[in-house]
Amino acid sequence: TFRMGSIPFLSKAAIGAQMDVDADFKTNKFILKENALSLNAIRATIDGWVAMTEKGMDMDIKLNSNEISFKEILSLIPAIYAKDFDGLKTSGEATLAAYAKGSMIGDSIMPAFDVNLNVKNAMFRYPSLPAGVDNINIAASVKNPGGSLDATTVSVNPFNLTLAGNPFSMTADVKT
């Protein structure tokens, strides 16, 4: 379970890992090779390295999900995952890719990072409901060039869907 304040972002999520790590304890550098992470039904590879320094951590880490089904993305939503998830009809594909590169020192200096989610031609429908959600297309990214978290930007363009025949479209750019 992950909460930010009083908002639950993940509830009773299943997390797994298969890790192959080369550890150099003299330099405090850990190299990640052929690793896999899972969060509910989503599987991703992770590779790169992390090094502990006197001030914090240096890193160059990449995460990639390749193509995953839209149903796997929906598995992250607690209400959907817990209730009638097996009967949920879905189609569409998604990709999730991320990286973090640079130094992390305390809470004030962060590495550069980029997280990208793309959903194409997706839909979902519960058999017991008269209509579903169709034509789901999302391109979302969270980016930071490194340094302060205040430099983080969030972009969503597009976020499109059709609910019971009614189209909905949104774009968002959030900067501090």
Feature locations, PLM:
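Hydrophobic lipid-interacting interfaces of membrane-associated proteins
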Residues: 1-55, 62-75, 90-105, 115-175
